[in-house]
Amino acid sequence: MMTENSNADLKEEVKEDSTGDPGESLGIKAILVGATGAIGECLLGELLASKNYSKIVVLGRREAQVPEKYGVDQKAEETSGRLKQHKVDFEQISNDTVGEYFKDNDVFFCTLGTTRKTAGSAEAFHRIDHDYVVNCAKVARDVGVSSVSYVSSQGANAKSWFLYPKTKGEVEEALKNLKFKFTSIYRPGLLDRGFKK
């Protein structure tokens, strides 16, 4: 994991702010993009299972489902207003179209990503993995979200000759240049989705 503008990642920041009472919520408000993917659905489950988060907003093309292993009553979380999901058109991301969803949140989590094969072309892949992510981050920054946490990839490098690591590296550079108060970038290796395609 790499962090920018901070000596602490989000978990360390939470620990420093904690009162020590495990039953007391820190009241962190989070917005998550990419909650229907392999990492995103697990992150959504972790956020909802944590008492540290008082509100989780999810943006996506379709509604996300919390994996059963987290023991979260998704319907109850939605009814209480702690979990709010909004379907959005990622081709139309701007302050005007989604700014209200980002407003008043403390941290923007982004696990959005695809593959060239799934996207259908190099251009479509770049649009999803780069443009959608950076456009969402710009909105988050513009409305005052102080922290961004982005799931990139092992080997990300903006100067790479290869599409996937180059795109991920370009996103990392764009996020650093947006100058959030806290920028956390995670570079996992291969993902084990737990099933065979």
Q: Which residue stretches match the model-derived regions?
A:
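NAD(P)H-binding glycine-rich loop region in Rossmannoid oxidoreductase-like domains
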Residues: A30, V72-N135, V139-D142
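N-terminal Rossmann NAD(P)H-binding glycine-rich loop of SDR-like oxidoreductase domains
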Residues: E24-N52
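Conserved acidic residues
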Residues: S54, D106-F109, S146, K181
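NAD(P)-dependent short-chain dehydrogenase/reductase
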Residues: R193-K197
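Conserved Rossmann-fold NAD(P)-dependent oxidoreductase catalytic core, especially the SDR/UDP-sugar
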Residues: T36, R62, T114, A119-Y186
